C-alpha cells in the first residue's frame, strides 16, 4: 500500500508473513521471502495492536518520539505480536538475524564502532524504537521506488533507484538535546537499513 496522507507512528514487533514457508523451503531457500526489519508501522501496526491478546504492552509502543530520552533496557523484553501457528499461544520473544546488528538496548552496532556486543535478548529501550521505526520506513521507501510497477512507468526502467532524502516534520520548539538524540537515531536507522539491504540472511 502507498499512503498519501499522514499515518500513525505506532510501532509493533511482528514477523513478516509471505504465505506458507514450506513452499519456499521446497525451492532450497528457506528465507527466500524474508523481510529483515522486525517491526511494522502506521496502519498495519495499529491493526496488529488492536488485535493483541495476552501480551499487551510487550509488542510495541505508540509515538516513540516521546521516549527519545528513555535509554533504559526493557526489563520484560519485547515479544512478537500475534498468535503462533496453533492459534492459541502468543508469538515468542523477539529474535532474528537483525539482532546481530544491534545491542540489547537497541543501539546500532555500526554507531558504536566496536564498543558494543550483539543482542542476545530483545531488551531494546523505548528510545531505540524510533530507530526501528525509521529503519522500516526507509526500507519500505526503497522497496517502493524500486518496485517493477514504479520503475516501468518512468525513464530508464532498468536503472535501480536510490533514496536521496526523507523529510520528517518535527515541532519547531524541539530542544537541541532532543534533536541530537533524534539525529543519532536517524543515523543508526540509515546504517541498519543499509546493513539489512546488503546482508544475506540465514533462516534465523
Predicted regions and their residues:
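Phosphate-binding loop and its immediate beta->loop->alpha context
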Residues: 1-166, 170-172, 176-178, 183-184
Amino acid at each position: 500500500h502507498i499512503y498519501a496522507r499522514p499515518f500513525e507512528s505506532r510501532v509493533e514487533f511482528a514477523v513478516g508473513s509471505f504465505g506458507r514457508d514450506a513452499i519456499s523451503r521446497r525451492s532450497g531457500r528457506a528465507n527466500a521471502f524474508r523481510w529483515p526489519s522486525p517491526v511494522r508501522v502506521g496502519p498495519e501496526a495499529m491493526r496488529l495492536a488492536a488485535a493483541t491478546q495476552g501480551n499487551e504492552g510487550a509488542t510495541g509502543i505508540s509515538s516513540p518520539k516521546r521516549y527519545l530520552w528513555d535509554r533504559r533496557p526493557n526489563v520484560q523484553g519485547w515479544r512478537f505480536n500475534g498468535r503462533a501457528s496453533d492459534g492459541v499461544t502468543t508469538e515468542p520473544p523477539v529474535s532474528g538475524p537483525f539482532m546481530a546488528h544491534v545491542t540489547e538496548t537497541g543501539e546500532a552496532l555500526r554507531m558504536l564502532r566496536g564498543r558494543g556486543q550483539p543482542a542476545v535478548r530483545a531488551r531494546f529501550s523505548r528510545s531505540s524504537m524510533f530507530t526501528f521505526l525509521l529503519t522500516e520506513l526507509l526500507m519500505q521507501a526503497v522497496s517502493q521506488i524500486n518496485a517493477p510497477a514504479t520503475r516501468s512507468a518512468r525513464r530508464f526502467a532498468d536503472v535501480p533507484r536510490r533514496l536521496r532524502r526523507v523529510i520528517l516534520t518535527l515541532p519547531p520548539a524541539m530542544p537541541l538535546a532532543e534533536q541530537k538524540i533524534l539525529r543519532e537515531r536517524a543515523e543508526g536507522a540509515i546504517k541498519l537499513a543499509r546493513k539489512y539491504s546488503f546482508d544475506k540472511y540465514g533462516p534465523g
